[in-house]
């Protein structure tokens, strides 16, 4: 699972580098970018039923801060934190 989280973190960091640290990053945008960078990526390979489940695990491990968008039901990435 940590390998998948690392891929997500790298993708988020690349998006922040490209769009700026204040950019609003949606979970779906992160997944699309990750699939472009690694076309073979599939969260189920790492044991996650959905990409949101992967994001939730990253947050549970203290590596991401998420916010649920009430209108869309999707996640917005608030920040990437350094693994402890």
Regions of interest found by a model, annotated:
Residues 1-84:
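N-terminal regulatory modules in eukaryotic regulatory proteins
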């Amino acid at each position: 699972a940590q390998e998948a989280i690392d891929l997500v973190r790298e993708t988020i960091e690349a998006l922040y580098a490209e769009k700026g640290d204040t950019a609003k990053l949606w979970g779906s945008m992160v997944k699309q970018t990750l699939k472009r960078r690694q076309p073979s990526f599939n969260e189920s390979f790492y044991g996650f039923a959905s990409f949101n489940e992967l994001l939730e695990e990253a947050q549970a491990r203290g590596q991401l801060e998420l916010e649920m968008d009430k209108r869309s039901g999707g996640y917005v990435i608030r920040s990437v934190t350094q693994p402890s």
